[in-house]
Amino acid sequence: MPELPEVETVRRGLELVTLKQPIVDVEVLLARSIALPKEPQAFIEHLRDRRIEQWQRRGKYLLATLDDGSRLVIHLRMSGQLLWLTTPQPPCPHTRVRWFFPTRAELRFVDQRTFGRCWWLPPDCRVAEAIPALATLAPEPLSEAFTVAFLAARLAHCRRSIKTALLDQSIVAGMGNIYADESLFLSGLHPTQSAHTLTPEQVQRLHGVICQVLREGIAAGGTTIRTFMSPAGVNGHYGGQAWVYGRKGEACRVCGTTIERLRLAGRSSHYCPQCQPLSSAIGK
């Protein structure tokens, strides 16, 4: 699933090519890709002839403000892509929604797994009421509101493993498997350590590392594991510099120990047994 750095990369790419341009037409090829309105034709009619004034990101959600005050919200979920095409092309496999712009350009939503969703919300609609998951998101991790004190308070009574806790969007908005593994490695924390057992010093270090890793991910244009690419069709480059994620069986870049992988709550976790010793996983 695209995580904060990947979604931010998409947001920046969309701002470069779609702002102020009228949406000439919309085509919906898979009805269930549209969450609201319930009828795809209504989605099409509300977006036709509108202009995108701004793109924002909240966690893993993309939010476009239109010239009439309405919103277009998109969540890429597991495999969604938003691709910008400057010349007409027939729909590729897994094309779900197409937005057409002047000069025959097209924004195309491609989603192999079909979990991605699009919402059109009227101007008087509160976004968090229409999409309840938005109401529970933690502050943006690169904002001033995401403080050490906030993170400490959220972890203090959390009995889950620290890896599972980091994937909770009410604790770290936009965090996913890749950057959680990277953050834990750089913090020296074993993924199975209970979140509530972290010392104040460990929480402070983890907070700083989360911000560092996410900034590095954004600077690298995200990570391409299987399907992610920017609207311009460019792969993310963070994966090539990853410390542990996706490197099972390879040597740790710090100590040379073989990177291992385990399963936690149905998700894979990559770690270095030497740099993230099991002895740190106290109080489980």
From Swiss-Prot:
Cofactor stoichiometry and binding remark: Binds 1 zinc ion per subunit.
Binding annotation for DNA: H94, R113
Keyword 4Fe-4S: no
GO biological process, one term: base-excision repair
Zn finger intervals (FPG-type): 243-277
EC number: 3.2.2.23, 4.2.99.18
Keyword hit for DNA-binding: yes
Quaternary data: Monomer.
Role this protein plays: Involved in base excision repair of DNA damaged by oxidation or by mutagenic agents. Acts as a DNA glycosylase that recognizes and removes damaged bases. Has a preference for oxidized purines, such as 7,8-dihydro-8-oxoguanine (8-oxoG). Has AP (apurinic/apyrimidinic) lyase activity and introduces nicks in the DNA strand. Cleaves the DNA backbone by beta-delta elimination to generate a single-strand break at the site of the removed base with both 3'- and 5'-phosphates.
Name of the protein: Formamidopyrimidine-DNA glycosylase
Species: Synechococcus elongatus
